[in-house]
Amino acid sequence: MKVILLTEVKKLGKKGDVVEVAEGYGRNYLIAKGLAVEATEGKLKELQQQKEAANRRKEKELQEARSLAEKLKNIELVLYGKGGENGKLFGAITSKDIAEALEKNYQIKIDKRKLDLKENIKALGVYTVEVKLHPEVTAKLKVAVKEEGRG
């Protein structure tokens, strides 16, 4: 009998897979425990539509990420900090500061966890920060840190 798995089942498959199983195993275990449903024509059609919708959604997310990467490529974000001697900052610029400045200045909302800042910025200068927008899309954002009052 053919069943559609509703959750991952060890040694059988993952959610959404259509698998052939013994009649008793399918009815008495998989379907009874809610791990699968019988693969009727209607259920197979529904599964296909769900997969197509998921693919469209993933493609849309990828396109949006690529578009955002293009925008970020052309931005030089300027942040100001209180400077000390030798170009050092009092305090540091964090990924949270960068995310907030992007939203405030460019209306681009990015989760601070997507900013790949190896360590907080503690000196004046220009830095390149990687932004992980999507598993397949990474953008580079220029961040210039200048001393307050000097511009």
Swiss-Prot record:
Any one of the GO CC terms: ribonucleoprotein complex
GO terms of biological process kind: translation
Gene3D superfamilies with a match to the protein in the record: Ribosomal protein L9, C-terminal domain, Ribosomal protein L9, N-terminal domain
InterPro entries listed in its UniProt record: Ribosomal_bL9, Ribosomal_bL9/RNase_H1_N, Ribosomal_bL9_bac/chp, Ribosomal_bL9_C, Ribosomal_bL9_C_sf, Ribosomal_bL9_N, Ribosomal_bL9_N_sf
UniProt keyword annotation of rRNA-binding present: yes
Superkingdom per UniProt: Bacteria
PROSITE patterns cross-referenced by the UniProt entry: RIBOSOMAL_L9 (PS00651)
Disulfide-bond pairs as recorded: none
Keyword Ribosomal protein among UniProt keywords: yes
GO molecular function (one): structural constituent of ribosome
Keywords: Ribonucleoprotein, Ribosomal protein, RNA-binding, rRNA-binding
HAMAP family registered for this protein in UniProt: Ribosomal_bL9
Family stated for the protein in its record: Belongs to the bacterial ribosomal protein bL9 family.
Summary of the function given for this chain in its UniProt record: Binds to the 23S rRNA.
Name this protein carries in UniProt: Large ribosomal subunit protein bL9
Species whose genome carries this gene: Carboxydothermus hydrogenoformans (strain ATCC BAA-161 / DSM 6008 / Z-2901)
Lineage: Bacteria, Bacillati, Bacillota, Clostridia, Thermoanaerobacterales
Gene name as annotated: rplI
